[in-house]
């Protein structure tokens, strides 16, 4: 259930709310624009205060995020806080819109990005954290993929100061932290093991190293830096000198840098000052200007999107439909009746439908067709989706796909975990239901019968958009929550989108790729 269904969102003067672009346990983020000037796009974060208090947070805890992010908003790689206020049940924060979307929505699991892209984002993250530590005295304490966004030119924007803390006092002395906070794979070992406390700024440096590893390999080195985790223990025993698994993909120069950062003893860990002098940080990326910002968004997008691919091959299809070990990558405990994933009418996302339909209408009216060619409706739809990077990731002809990508490259907030289909619902839903079951996601049986009941109640024209809320666990045992939305764009053309709410973006993309492969026969692919 969305927060707006629990309590109506407050009205914000002169601001028009749009789609929900993110949602967590006690907060949601919507895009918005100014009423007087729709060209000025914003993001509004709504924090549900009663839910926060149920989770044990005080008023000071709730407002601390605003205080610290406001203090840290004068750096180009930190998401800027514009305004905030409190209503009866919500605290709302107006932020600049990261209109390039999520960085890790664009990274292929188990592949990562090429060295130039990793270097560029590593440099920008180091710059942002250096600003936080040196000029603001603030440690972020939750550096992870979910909190790395992009602007319209592809520049990194560090977001979410919910766990941040002021580690340096006004007199220059450093506070010692005692609490365990952060996301397990990105957490520094001293957060778990230090009995005398730790310095929060040093834990940020560790998290930067883990994020760099993920950029280079498309996976985390371990689930938790714990002595119970064999991957982490192996790393410690070999003093970071590893050449197997994902470590074997990393060039020697980058391995050397990672070993300096991922030093379990925080007193031996490289400092930010030393990190800024590393050759990989000093050498400018090919699409980076003197100010460290992207000066060639098209080249950056080309490099970033080039590794995105969903293979619908027979080999992958057989692996996902017949291999028991593959099917068990995602774990789902036996749910009680009301936890079964089921098909519902999504009354909260009318705006999303309107935007998608407007995109097609705009494309349709701006496209000149040669009446002599007699272009079919299906050909028109296929041409329309060729403007969406999400559709191109299924293309089997790499050269043809690269040409399409070059024509339509741009950063935008649209999710890439999506496919299009022309299949009727009596074909689409049984195949989707099969894919969910094979992914160990428990579904209320017969999605199509449920769809027919909704049609009787609402009528076919009013039944869309549809939503299936899903909950599962990754191989590491961490929760993945999100939804699958089915949106009717025009007549038979529909989009099937996978929206992550909580959990690792790379694990969510793995799940999307698996379900898409099982649904391969219904996916519309540009050709």
From Swiss-Prot:
EC number(s) per UniProt? 2.7.11.1
A single GO BP annotation from the record? Answer: replication fork processing
Q: Which SUPFAM superfamilies match?
A: Protein kinase-like (PK-like)
Q: Where is the Protein kinase domain?
A: 15-281
EC class of this enzyme? transferase
Cell cycle keyword on record = yes
Task: List the catalysed reactions.
Answer: L-seryl-[protein] + ATP = O-phospho-L-seryl-[protein] + ADP + H(+); L-threonyl-[protein] + ATP = O-phospho-L-threonyl-[protein] + ADP + H(+)
Keywords of the record, alphabetical order, are: ATP-binding, Cell cycle, DNA damage, Kinase, Nucleotide-binding, Nucleus, Serine/threonine-protein kinase, Transferase
Q: Where is the active site?
A: 142
What is the superkingdom listed in this entry's lineage? Eukaryota
Q: Where is this chain primarily localised?
A: nucleus
Q: Which GO terms describe its cellular component?
A: cytoplasm; nucleus; site of double-strand break
Residue numbers binding ATP: 21-29, 45
Say if the entry is tagged with keyword Nucleus. Answer: yes
InterPro entries for the chain: Kinase-like_dom_sf, Prot_kinase_dom, Protein_kinase_ATP_BS, Ser/Thr_kinase_AS
Protein name in UniProt: Serine/threonine-protein kinase CHK1
Taxonomic source organism: Saccharomyces cerevisiae (strain ATCC 204508 / S288c)
Q: Which gene encodes it?
A: CHK1
């Amino acid at each position: 259930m969305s927060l707006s269904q629990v309590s109506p969102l407050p009205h914000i003067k002169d601001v028009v709310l749009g789609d929900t672009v993110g949602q967590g346990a006690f907060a949601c983020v919507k895009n918005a624009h100014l009423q007087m000037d729709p060209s000025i796009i914003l993001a509004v974060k709504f924090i549900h205060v009663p839910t926060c208090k149920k989770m044990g947070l005080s008023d000071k805890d709730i407002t601390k995020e605003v205080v610290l992010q406001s203090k840290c908003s004068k750096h180009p790689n930190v998401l800027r806080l514009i305004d905030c206020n409190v209503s009866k049940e919500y605290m709302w924060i107006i932020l600049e819109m990261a209109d390039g979307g999520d960085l890790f929505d664009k990274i292929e699991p188990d592949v990562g990005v090429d060295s130039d892209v990793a270097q560029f984002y590593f440099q920008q993250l180091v710059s942002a954290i250096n600003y936080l530590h040196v000029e603001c005295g603030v440690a972020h304490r939750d550096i992870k993929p979910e909190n790395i966004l992009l602007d319209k030119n592809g520049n990194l924007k560090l977001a979410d100061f919910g766990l941040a803390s002021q580690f340096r006092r006004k007199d220059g002395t450093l506070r010692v932290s005692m609490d365990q906070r952060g996301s397990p794979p990105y957490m520094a070992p001293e957060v778990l093991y230090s009995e005398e406390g730790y310095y929060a700024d040093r834990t940020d440096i560790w998290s930067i190293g883990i994020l760099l590893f993920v950029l280079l390999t498309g996976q985390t080195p371990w689930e938790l830096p714990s002595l119970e985790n064999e991957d982490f223990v192996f790393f410690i025993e070999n003093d970071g000198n590893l050449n197997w698994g994902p470590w074997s993909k990393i060039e020697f120069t980058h391995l050397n840098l990672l070993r300096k950062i991922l030093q379990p003893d925080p007193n031996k860990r490289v400092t930010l000052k030393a990190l800024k002098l590393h050759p990989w940080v000093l050498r400018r990326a090919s699409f980076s200007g003197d100010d460290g910002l992207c000066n060639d968004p098209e080249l950056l997008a080309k490099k970033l999107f080039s590794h995105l691919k969903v293979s619908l091959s027979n080999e992958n299809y057989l692996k996902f439909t017949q291999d028991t070990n593959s099917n068990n990558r995602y774990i789902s405990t036996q749910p009680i009746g009301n936890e079964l994933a089921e098909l519902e009418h999504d009354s909260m996302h009318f705006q999303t439908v309107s935007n998608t339909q407007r995109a097609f209408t705009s494309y349709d009216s701006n496209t000149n067709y040669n009446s002599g060619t007699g272009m079919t409706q299906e050909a028109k739809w296929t041409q329309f989706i060729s403007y969406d990077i999400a559709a191109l990731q299924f293309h089997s002809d790499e050269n043809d796909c690269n040409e399409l990508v070059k024509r339509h490259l741009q950063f935008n907030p649209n999710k890439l975990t999506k496919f299009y289909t022309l299949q009727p619902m009596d074909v689409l839903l049984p195949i989707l239901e099969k894919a969910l079951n094979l992914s160990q996601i428990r579904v209320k049986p017969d999605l199509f019968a449920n769809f027919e009941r909704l049609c009787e109640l609402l009528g076919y024209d009013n039944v869309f958009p549809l939503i299936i809320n899903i909950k599962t666990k990754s191989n590491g045992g961490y929760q993945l929550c999100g939804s699958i939305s089915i949106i009717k764009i025009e007549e038979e053309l529909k989009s099937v989108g996978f929206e992550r709410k909580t959990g690792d973006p790379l694990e969510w993309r793995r799940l999307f790729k698996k379900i898409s492969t099982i649904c391969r026969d219904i996916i519309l692919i540009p050709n």
